[in-house]
Amino acid sequence: MESVSCSAAPVRSGDMESQRDMSLVPERLQRREQERQLEVERRKQKRQNQEVEKENSHFFAATFARERAAVEELLERAESVERLEEAASRLQGLQKLINDSVFFLAAYDLRQGQEALARLQAALAERRRELQPKKRFAFKTRGKDAASCTKVDAAPGIPPAVESIQDSPLPKKAEGDLGSSWLCGFSNLESQVLEKRASELHQRDVLLTELSNCTVRLYGNPNTLRLTKAHSCKLLCGPVSTSVFLEDCSDCVLAVACQQLRIHSTKDTRIFLQVTSRAIVEDCSGIQFAPYTWSYPEIDKDFESSGLDRSKNNWNDVDDFNWLARDMASPNWCILPEEERNIQWD
């Protein structure tokens, strides 16, 4: 009686590969279908985002035009301080509208809005000057009282400057400015402690230029801030309603809060930043970023006045115009290590 063999015939390697290929077909098809669905979803989301941005842009244009017309009418017919304060309040609303719209507005529309706002702010300042009572002419003798006017008055809770200061002459116009004269600031100073208070800074354009080994404290809410040709300086500034410009600086430490930060031709500088849009660097090296940590009495009030959203901070969202590679980090800037962020500001 012959025995029946139960052993299976040997399987050739070619047959195994064929079976493996067959088993992978459904998986490949499934993956391809998933990728197709993801692409469809991405396109759908992109269309929705474009529609939302378009609607937001239309809303911005209509709201801005309406509020601008209201402010212009208030300024044209303003015959009292109350009317001017209403115009100032509406301008703060316009500033907040611009700040909230910076992510979806085209660069041209954003620039047009900022320039229109700057013109309205200048017109408001002019109307305030016109409505101020005329001072009667009288001869005055210069004495101790006049000399003492150059000293910095210390605000409650804020340490005074080490030495009294006097505003140094400033250029009437800075190259590449935003179309308005620089109204206050410091220039051509070395190894000094310099301060300005909220009453001096409110919605004004500040220029700091050619400073060396200086500490500058700006307690308040400027409109714009420009720091140029500074070396080994420490700059502490309250919330800036629009932009901060930094150019030709080295070995500095800054604490600034703003809508946008632009840095040009600067090296070896640490920046403690609060920014609602983003920072832009160009022709720079050795720039380090960390979150904004400076504080002082009344800073909450200044943030409210500036129109900046304090809960929004893109301090580490930096564009380097000299580094276009998306898959590699720029060598020109970096995040300041946490162990190096403990700075005694005052």
UniProtKB/Swiss-Prot annotation:
Residues bearing PTM Phosphoserine: 80, 168
- UniProt domain C-CAP/cofactor C-like: residue ranges: 171-323
Which GO molecular function terms does the record list?
GTPase activity; tubulin binding
| Annotated localization | Cytoplasm
Q: Name one GO biological process term.
A: tubulin complex assembly
List-wise, which residues carry N-acetylmethionine?
1
| Gene Ontology, cellular component aspect | cytoplasm; photoreceptor connecting cilium
Region Disordered: start and end of each range? Answer: 1-54
Q: Which Pfam families match?
A: TBCC (PF07986), TBCC_N (PF16752)
Q: What does this protein do?
A: Tubulin-folding protein; involved in the final step of the tubulin folding pathway.
What protein name does the entry list? Answer: Tubulin-specific chaperone C
